[in-house]
């Protein structure tokens, strides 16, 4: 149940390897549930996490909560199989970790299109979201936002961004305020 322009005020992350927690996530009434295949899953557990994800997507009644999946970054050997499982399972959308450029979005879009065709899914059904985690990615935000009609949003991954910037979190969030502001302008301008 996904719409490109639906209201997304709250996004709850859940580990794909913990179906017992994922199945009850609707209780908290998030606008979107992001099932994680990336940071929450250790390297040697990626295959079993995808297996779990597929069964979660196929069997759990999310009661109207949007089902997004955070896939592994493009610099890993996992992202293509992540996409195939997301599409085969019927995920509403995919959150691309460590998106650096419009080309990253286009590469993921092509893989999603191929998977939709392979699994007989409606073309264009699977939406995309880009997580920007570096200063370079933030500076590329306008091009990233224009990269695909499937893209419904961009998000700043604050922890990773801070590591790249060699800064520490502040109570006010002033350390990431400029990046957030630029990303809002980029999203609004496109």
What do the PLM-derived regions correspond to, one by one?
Residues 1-190:
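Expand to "…catalyze enediolate/carbanion chemistry for C-C bond making/breaking, isomerization
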């Amino acid at each position: 149940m996904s719409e490109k322009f639906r209201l997304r005020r709250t996004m709850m992350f859940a580990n794909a390897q913990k179906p017992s927690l994922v199945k009850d996530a609707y209780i908290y009434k998030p606008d979107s549930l992001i099932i994680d295949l990336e940071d929450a899953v250790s390297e040697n557990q990626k295959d079993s996490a995808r297996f779990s994800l597929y069964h979660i997507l196929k069997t759990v009644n999310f009661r109207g909560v949007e089902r997004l999946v955070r896939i592994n970054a493009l610099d890993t050997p996992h992202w293509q199989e992540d996409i195939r499982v997301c599409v085969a399972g019927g995920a509403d959308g995919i959150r691309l970790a460590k998106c650096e450029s419009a080309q990253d979005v286009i590469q993921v879009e092509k893989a999603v299109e191929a998977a939709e065709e392979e699994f007989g899914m409606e073309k264009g059904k699977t939406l995309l979201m880009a997580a920007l985690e570096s200063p370079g990615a933030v500076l590329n935000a306008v091009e990233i936002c224009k990269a695909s009609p499937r893209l419904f949003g961009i998000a700043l991954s604050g922890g990773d961004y801070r590591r790249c910037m060699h800064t520490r979190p502040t109570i006010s969030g002033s350390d990431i305020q400029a990046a957030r502001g630029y990303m809002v302008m980029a999203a609004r301008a496109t």
